[in-house]
Amino acid sequence: LMGGYEIIDLASLLIDKRLVKRLGGSNWKTDRIEAANIWAKEHGRAPFEISEIQWSLAHCTPRTWGDDTLVCMTEEERMWYEKQNMPVMCFAPQAKGLFSKLLAGKEETLSTTAKRRFLTTENLALAPKVQALCQRLQVSPAAVAMAYLTSQKNPTIAIAGSSRIEQITETLGGADLTLTEEDLLFLQS
C-alpha cells in the first residue's frame, strides 16, 4: 500500500502541470487522509479535498460487500468528515433500492448481491423508521435515503445509479428534501 504522502507528492505534479485543480481519494479511511493532508501542509503540497466511499442510510461493511479494500462509512468516520467539513461522494446511496423494496413488500425482488450487502437485522430494524418519515413527509423511501446523505453537516454528493427511468424519477423526486437534525437523529438512533 503506497503511503499517502507518496500519492500527495506524485499528485502535486499533476497540479503543478495544471492537469488537475484539486485532489480526492477513493476508499481511503479518514486516518490515512488526515496523515496525508498533514504531510501535504508541512511540505507545501495540495491536500485531499474530497473523498469517495460507500455511504448510505443502510448500514453495510466491507465484509458484507466481500471486499476488504472497500471503505464504508462508520460513525467515527462520519464525525471526522463533519469536523473537517470535507465533502464526501457517496456511492451506492440507495443500497440497491433496499428501503424502497422492503417498504413496498417486495423483499423477494432484491438481488442476491443486495441481500448479501444490505439485508441485515440492523437495516430491517431501520425500515419502520424510514416508513414513518415517508408517511410524515409524504415522500418515497428513495427520497428519505438520499436526503439522509444530503442533509448531513458536511457537503455530500450522492452518486445514484439506476436501471430504469422510474428509479431516477423516484430518486430525484425528493431532491429538494432536507431532513432536520431531529429526523437524522431519529434514523441514527
PLM regions: where:
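Beta/alpha (TIM)-barrel catalytic core signal, keyed to glycine-rich beta->alpha loops juxtaposed to Asp/Glu
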Residues: 1-188
